[in-house]
Amino acid sequence: PADELFGRRHTDSVASRSTEMVVHGISMGAATTMMVSGEVEHGQYQQPFIKCFVEDCGYTSVWDEFRGELKAQFNLPAFPLLHTANWLCRQEYGWDFLEASALEQVKKCTLPMLFIHGDADTFVPTWMVYPLYEAKPEPKELWIVPGATHAMSYKDYPQEYTEHVKKFVGKYIH
């Protein structure tokens, strides 16, 4: 995406050899964080200053998220609507919903990742964090936030959230 490329160029221009960076995203930002986490070439990240990732309530894939929302919001099955929309996306834009898979990207991630998800999230259902966590090679940590709905973990538990993130990040940023 253009914003990711801009971010890379901008970061490259301000980063020095001593720069240490955490990529942290919530909701769509979490999905983007996980997508970026798998962008490696020859086993190396293009940005060596990235030290770890924190994702908060990201989805497994666009397909899974759309399928879940069709069911939850409209009580509709994936077929034929999602299949048709996927076909149209492939025709018009050259990619499909199955390609936008954070699950596939985290499998390639070699850097540490903290997974955060509210146990009351129904927009990006809590179940999605478990296959993501299982797919990600070590090092990794998981924090399920009791009672938190979608993207509300920090708002509901600001002190605990900050402590979890600082403790995790502190292992990798010096």
What are these regions (language model features)?
Residues 25-29, 33:
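Gly/Ala-rich beta-loop-alpha elbow adjacent to hydrolase catalytic centers
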Residues 102, 111, 125-134:
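Short alpha-helix in the alpha/beta-hydrolase fold that links the catalytic acid
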Residues 133-151, 164:
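Catalytic histidine neighborhood in serine/cysteine hydrolases
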Residues 156-174:
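Catalytic active-site module of serine/aspartate enzymes centered on a nucleophile-bearing elbow/loop
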Residues 119-124, 151-152:
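Acidic catalytic loop of the alpha/beta-hydrolase fold
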Residues 1-14:
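Alpha/beta-hydrolase active-site loop
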Residues 35-98, 104:
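Hydrolase active-site cap/lid region
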Residues 108-110, 115-117, 121:
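Short beta-strand/loop motif that positions the catalytic acidic residue
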